[in-house]
């Protein structure tokens, strides 16, 4: 008996079945780096239209977490997909290197500046520490498969970048947006510094909730407003507050001009309250009986004066729209030094902006005997007792409410009026211009627009000064007496920037003012403040994008960060760009959600539900992490767990196995010599290429709209449905048994080749390592890397006007599905083993029969049976099985003949060929003759 196995075209490839990614990926990375893959891509894309995704800099502190992985991989997917779309898309990663977290780490190592080390030594250690953190994070980002200019990233502590940050401040000053003022700012006593909006988080806190009486200074004048001549006891305007510690700074009581206020008599005292709140105040104060003596509008009480409850001065009643009826008494205790609304209304009435609290959060000497030197939050109970002793406390209770806290220390913060530098939102129309610019940006998801519009519309002036050591200096000179900026500020800023560009920020602190001011040095002093780190990162469109040569002077096309950055980097970048350029720094802003565990819980070390990207890469490989991110709808919360990653690994195996099948069956195929022209190909092969074409159209549209989970879904559908459950199954017979160089086989290989060329490109942005590996096994001459290529343009499909068009094959697929059900039932009943043991008779109506008959003798190949007959529907015997397809019944029987040892089909002509007596006639033709002809399947 002959060994016919050697006559088969069995699949063969060196492409491994197992990905073994954790082991294989580092070797690939080494090759990418040694061959300068990023540089190769840049050279290949030179001269193309640019797409610039500007990297929002992560903070240079600590190891990367799973959220970092999401962010960087999403960016990498976009950059790579844009490259495949024909763009030159350089990616320059960056890091945020100044600021408090690094200072705190360095303090733990060497102590505070000015104690064990000088400020200069402290800054040098901060720079060294930040560089170490950058190196660690960089290694992890590279391990993720993210391609970028890792040898030349931007760091906000680069001397040139520090200088350009200073220059950005100079342009803001030139355009009239900077001012100085003693405004209340978020202040952290633990930090000893002002905080930016983005550095504030909210947590629940329990505070005293108190109603406090302010007695009228001129009782008769107050009573006259209510049309009352006398009352029993003192007349008091009642305020409600949850911050008793701010009462020493009280300088007014705010009322709403439009509200109705009532004079209410209780036992031994007359109270002034908003009419709509009288009942709720009485209820919480435990007062069951009261009498309304009179009423008036809030406007009637303007500028009447009331005695401070424990300090020896009186304060005016003033009017403000910020007073509401949501809670309280309708009268708001007003301390301009401790609240933005209070500050605005105090400015309007030209009131003192009192700030009796020092930078450490303790009262200054001279505030009040029992309070001097006390920490404000510890003083709350003291103040309640003082009010009780003075008879000014109407009611006290504990209230749990959301309270602003320091993002770093998690401790409650205060509003505190300090001399600070601000970017004004309104003095030169920055708010109005920013709101206008927002409308010209594409926000993805689109709810991002309303979110940032609300933030810009309601935000206060931006306090950009900080009292820190490790930061970019404001580099300003102010007059010793007037505190006005030097008239040559623009020129001086450039002079300082040049020194910083040469020697770093220490150059500012080492600078002798006389070196740049000359004789003016006697009258001007250096501003000691540093810039808010959000100014550092928010100015990178100017300090980095505008100056890096690879960006060619183009503005950024996209900013992509987590959804918390609407009030962070997106906001600060918008403010600075609009202030210095009059336009937004980006065309598109894309946000992603935060990672949660499989149960939807926030990641927390204390819960123990964190997922380490390093662990995932070491165990499963970066491509599994990348596929998980690519397959997730990142617009909301992004769930990750061992089980979810396992599902990603399963999906990966399906895709890898498909790719391996394609490669194995391209063995011996040279696309230059062996390709079959589309018009000469077997119809089914053209259909398969058409499936790839249809899939590519959807995949490219999904990449274009950044819906990467749709890319993965369509890729999986293509591999599992069109290919895995139909086409790849059907072609095995023709691929393995036809003559190796026959049109029948080469047609199939031509289809597999086109499909492979497309598939590897679809995968490349998401499963980059695997795509590169597949690329290296594909036949034919090609570029060194798939990442330098564009989407495959060699796909074609069936014309809708053809008889065997896509709709025709869709019907064949439905018939095959019904046949499979009948075969499966027969196997379960032990009537047959495999499908090739079956012969099926399809009883079809005229319409369906007409389609099935077009496949002629090749129909059984499409059904994976040894025989297939088509009969009239009405001739179906009772034993024929009904199907879910209207007009189709199926009868199954055992195939006649014997099993051919070569093709495994059951045939009645085995032995008919004398030269090859062991095999069927078809195989004999394929082995020793001209080979079978296939037209359809």
Curated annotation (Swiss-Prot):
The keyword Transferase does not apply. Its cofactor is Zn(2+). It is found in: Cytoplasm. It is an enzyme of class 6 (ligase). InterPro entries: aa-tRNA-synth_I_CS, aa-tRNA-synth_Ia, Anticodon_Ile_BEm, Ile-tRNA-ligase, Ile-tRNA-ligase_type1, Ile-tRNA_ligase, M/V/L/I-tRNA-synth_anticd-bd, Rossmann-like_a/b/a_fold. ATP binds at residue 605. One of its GO terms (biological process) is isoleucyl-tRNA aminoacylation. GO terms for cellular component: cytosol. Binds 1 zinc ion per subunit. A motif ('HIGH' region) lies at residues 58-68. PANTHER family: ISOLEUCINE--TRNA LIGASE, MITOCHONDRIAL (PTHR42765:SF1), SOLEUCYL-TRNA SYNTHETASE (PTHR42765). IleRS has two distinct active sites: one for aminoacylation and one for editing. The misactivated valine is translocated from the active site to the editing site, which sterically excludes the correctly activated isoleucine. The single editing site contains two valyl binding pockets, one specific for each substrate (Val-AMP or Val-tRNA(Ile)). This is Isoleucine--tRNA ligase. The gene is ileS.
